[in-house]
Amino acid sequence: DHIGSVRDTLPGRDGYALSGITLVGSLIHFDKLVDRGWPDYDFPSREKVLAADKGFIEHYFRFIEHQRSLGMVAEKFENGSRKQFAMKYDPKPYARDFEIRNLASNGEMWTGKGMKTRKMYSGDINLFDENMNSCAIRLRYGKFSYYNGGDLSGGNLDMPSYPSKERDFESQIAGVCG
């Protein structure tokens, strides 16, 4: 769920170190990169974003800019969208059966109606950690459905480090995910 680590980098030749996504992106061309923070990276604040991956985030930003110069498109993850991750080849025969729905990111989730979203927590900074930023999607193909929510909080709410049910994002998302 992390973009890379400054401790585990290989030297790169395009102005950024290679680790995590920058390493994979140097080996496999991405047509599109979808990121929860693009282009501002200001949730919950720019300072918190820069501190979260200290030493590596700058390499990630340079990677994005370099890849964009080669034709990659960068987009912000759109909560509620079912078009951001569309089938590229021959989509018509699968239009009714295939969908990737963006469910949540940045502590905000799709309501299940149109493109409407709502906050999943009150904004209490004491409850916040980077896991609450995770992007969640549901892939549906016919009767098959798959959910991925990265590191979204949920589960054992009796732990002292998680004193609030407000941190249980997964249960909230389950209602619209199905």
Language-model features: locations:
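Long, structured stretches of catalytic cores involved in phosphate-ester chemistry, encompassing
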Residues: 168-178
